[in-house]
Amino acid sequence: MEVTIENAGLERLGELLAWRETVLREVFSLPAEADLTGLMAENRRYYEAALPRGEHTACFAVAERKIVGCGGICWQKEMPSPDNPQGTCGCLMNIYTLPQHRGAGVGEKIVQWLITEANRRETGKIYLEASQKGASLYQKLGFEALNGYMKL
């Protein structure tokens, strides 16, 4: 199965939102009847603002003319430092592959494409929240678990 990665801009907003809802339902184990109307409206506003400003890059993995996965990276700035002189950070989000295509390298292609985008932007740090299912993929690609981070 040949997989290509396509940039997904605002012209694909409907697809982006549909895939975002799929990801949210699976990752958060939400039942089909859970009402995500408000959350999806917020996601729409996010994409409508962030994509044109270059604050988010989204992509789809396509095989046999069908979308089989998706991913994105949120861009942000931090104070420049020796380990990130440009101060550019990326946070991988929404990395997802349809269950029937898992284990075929789709997720790896998505993440590699996003890493290439990050390198093009001279991104000094790339972060992500890894699910148990995804941790081995990220480790294979060179990501390391971080100690010392806290969340409120």
Q: In which residue ranges do the predicted regions lie?
A:
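Conserved catalytic-core motifs of GNAT/GCN5-like acyltransferases
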Residues: E78-S81, Y127-E129, K133, Q139, ...
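Conserved GNAT acetyl-CoA-binding A-motif
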Residues: A118-A130
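Conserved N-terminal entry element of GNAT/NAT acetyltransferase domains
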Residues: M1-G14
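A short helix-loop-beta-strand connector motif used in the catalytic cores of GNAT acetyltransferases and
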Residues: R45-F60, C91
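Conserved acetyl-CoA binding element of GNAT-fold acetyltransferases
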Residues: D83-P99, G148
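Conserved beta-strand in the GNAT
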Residues: F60, K66-W75, C91, Y96
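Conserved GNAT-fold acetyl-CoA-binding loop/helix
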Residues: L24-Y46
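Conserved acetyl-CoA pyrophosphate-binding loop and the N-cap/start of the following alpha-helix
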Residues: H101, G105-W113
